[in-house]
UniProtKB/Swiss-Prot annotation:
EC number assigned by the record: 2.4.1.-
Keyword presence, Transmembrane helix: yes
UniProt name for this protein: C-mannosyltransferase dpy-19
Organism: Caenorhabditis briggsae
Pfam families: Dpy19
CC annotations in GO: endoplasmic reticulum membrane
């Protein structure tokens, strides 16, 4: 393999041109057409998700404080740091505030850039401040404000336009998210050698948009920023494998997509681990030349170290599977020439798999144990809980949420009704038939080193990894659905499904028929999305925040459920002790202590816990103490019976809070005191 690989790029790519060229179209015109269509579908995707977001929230008619409340749970946490930077006296002072933060986890200072992957907020704030200053000096109209009448609620001022910090932020999110369609188009072209394949891929994405992304509902989430770079990285990688590239320029291109993806989302490390596994599969099948493989692994190693430094030495990056797998694949790549004499393919695959697996797991365990890093322990606990009876308080908080549960049958049904899954399976079957007819599974030969479709094998293995992730955790279907769309594009590859034996007109007619079949259910899906109309309003939370602003000190410390705490920090700027970013062992311990307010522990013990944490007020919602007869282990009462069995026979604190709220008698909950209880929703306890 090594002998052939050395000349892989010198001998020229195995396809002509930069992208595959259809007959009758010159190279430059072909490339220009592909680039322009890709940019156009990206713009359409941007417009679509922007429209869906506006329709759902009626965002243009909300006041800024309502927009802040609309960023629920961790979305509000992330946006709060953007707000901190743009309202600071200077950009550098704003960055200093978030790298020496004492508000998010009251009681100690944290570097939120290290912990929360906040580079999107830093970049957008960096762009917003000079943009706003330039607009002001040039007297540009970048924001329009008016008064909105809200019926029984007080009128508010609503401002619209790119000059508004919220609009600047969400526009940045949606511009980045729009590129997903661009990358999918390019990937469709690459795997099908056809513009029609790219169009087919994008149409599948559009027709299954609701099962492919949630950026239109949750813009500030980390995946909204990172996934476009992940899918863009996959497109670049597919191009490099297809054309057997290994130059420094291609190395830098891979790094340029990998670094933002790693900086923007903690889960990217796991996504890239699956990519490493997929590359390993293609390389071990002799489908990726040695020089190309070296370029790929160097890019991952470089991207890792750049990101590690920029995230101030994020410990979880060291302990995650991604870093060990890079070294494992590098070892496989660099020792593979020594194994060139092994012609029996199963033996060759077994040896490489043992090397790859043992190094990955060995380094993973070694780094975690040696450095005492437990930040990612909850991930393996979640996976363990899905296949065994194991459960604890932390796994329940995840697995009781639908998005962290197994994929729902309804999702499979929807993707099947639009023919996405059936056509993807047809594509896989057609490709497998063609590939297996040309490839020896038993013996490695020199001819196999020139086998085509290395990029397709990589993407199919990546699809398997993505599907596995989605089946285990429904939230991760954002990886599976786009890759199913890429796979369907294979049907436009003229070498499959009959190849040259079928006339071009017949093949084109079949593909047009496929599009018509996809559109039959796909277009109603788009209409259904566009018909979703809503208007955000949360008067109870608005009243709560008004009370906090008027009746508590600026340094008063709050605790409560994770979703509410993020909004308390964002809107009232009060210090909090817990928050929704749960991927750190320290915050998991803190949250367990805070949630003891829903346990059956003695009142005095819980009060002492709150005092030690420096909490002044606890925000409580009656729904926090609800029962669920269908899944009793998924409410706080049941979670605490499981977590703290020795106190399971005692009276639940939930019952005491509710009794005190209804009777307006604090004697049963002393030394706690209810200081806010205007309705049957939010209650504030003073510690």
């Amino acid at each position: 393999m090594a002998k052939k690989a050395k000349n892989s790029e010198k001998n020229g790519p195995r396809h002509s041109g930069n992208f595959s060229q259809e007959s009758g179209i010159s190279g430059n015109l072909w490339l220009a057409t592909v680039v322009l269509i890709g940019l156009f579908v990206g713009f359409l995707n941007y417009q679509h998700i922007y429209t869906l977001f506006e329709n759902d929230k009626h965002f243009s008619h909300l006041a800024d404080f309502e927009r802040e409340m609309a960023y629920r749970t961790e979305m509000g946490l992330y946006y709060s740091y953007y707000k901190t930077i743009i309202t600071a006296p200077s950009f550098l002072e704003g960055v200093q505030l978030i790298t020496r933060d004492t508000v998010t986890e009251h009681g100690h200072q944290i570097n939120t850039l290290n912990r929360f992957n906040l580079y999107p907020e830093v970049i957008l704030a960096f762009l917003y401040r000079p943009f706003r200053a330039l607009a002001k000096s040039a007297n540009w109209q970048v924001e329009t404000c008016w008064q909105v009448n809200r019926g029984d609620l007080r009128p508010v001022e609503s401002c619209e336009g790119i000059g508004n910090p919220h609009y600047f932020y969400i526009t940045g999110v949606f511009v980045v998210a729009g590129t997903v369609a661009t990358s999918l188009f390019y990937l469709g072209v690459l795997v099908s050698d056809s513009i029609f394949g790219g169009i087919l891929s994008v149409l599948c994405f559009a027709f299954n948009h609701g099962e492919a992304t949630r950026v239109q509902w949750t813009p500030p989430l980390r995946e909204s920023f990172a996934f476009p770079f992940i899918i863009g990285h996959i497109a670049i990688l597919t191009y490099i494998i297809k054309y057997r590239k290994s130059s420094t320029a291609h190395l830098l291109l891979l790094i340029s997509a990998a670094v933002p993806a790693l900086l923007f989302w903690q889960f990217t490390q796991f996504a890239f681990f699956t990519q490493i596994c997929s590359i390993f599969a293609a390389f071990s099948m002799d489908l990726v030349p040695l020089d190309t493989a070296k370029t790929i692994i160097k890019s991952h190693l470089s991207a890792f170290f750049i990101s590690f430094v920029m995230l101030f030495g994020n410990e979880m990056m060291i302990a995650a599977l991604y870093f060990p797998s890079i070294w494992a694949l590098a070892t496989v790549i660099y020792i593979s020439p020594m194994l060139a004499g092994i012609r029996l393919r199963p033996l060759y695959l077994l040896i490489l798999a043992l090397i790859f697996g043992s190094i990955t797991l060995g380094l993973k365990v070694g780094f975690s144990k040696g450095l005492g890093i437990e930040d990612d322990a909850h991930i393996f606990d979640i996976l363990r809980s899905k296949f065994t009876s194991f459960a604890n308080f932390h796994t329940r908080l995840y697995t009781c949420s639908a998005e962290f549960d197994f994929i729902q049958y309804a999702t499979i049904e929807k993707l099947s009704s639009t023919l996405l899954i059936p056509l993807a399976l047809l594509s896989i079957g057609a490709f497998s038939w063609d590939f297996l007819s040309k490839t020896s599974l038993l013996w490695r030969t020199l001819e196999n080193e020139d086998s085509e479709y290395g990029e397709v094998i990589y993407n199919l293995v990546q699809l398997i990894c993505s599907t596995t992730m989605a089946v285990l955790i429904m939230r991760l279907k954002l990886f599976m659905t786009p890759h199913l769309c890429i796979t369907v594009a294979l049907l436009a590859n003229s070498k499959l499904l009959g190849g040259d034996k079928i006339a071009k007109t017949v093949r084109s007619s079949v593909l047009v028929g496929l599009v018509a079949m996809l559109a039959f259910r796909g277009i109603p899906n788009i209409r259904h999305q566009l018909n979703i109309k809503g208007e955000y309003s949360n008067p109870d939370q608005e009243m709560l925040f008004d009370w906090i602003q008027s009746n508590t000190k600026q340094d008063a410390v709050f605790a409560g459920t994770m979703p509410v705490m993020a909004n308390v920090k964002l809107t009232t700027l009060r210090p909090i002790v817990n928050h929704p970013h749960y991927e750190h062992v320290g915050i998991r311990d803190r949250t367990l202590k805070v949630y003891s307010m829903f346990s059956k522990k003695p009142v005095a013990e819980v009060h002492q816990t709150m005092k030690k944490m420096g909490v002044n007020y606890f925000i409580f919602q009656l729904m926090n103490c609800s029962n669920d007869e269908r899944r009793p282990e998924c409410v706080y009462r049941g979670m605490w019976d499981e977590e703290d069995p020795k106190n399971s026979a005692r009276t639940s604190l939930c019952d005491l809070w509710i009794l005190a709220a209804n009777s307006k008698d604090n004697s049963r909950i002393s030394p706690f005191k209810i200081v806010y209880n205007p309705n049957r929703n939010y209650i504030v306890l003073k510690i």
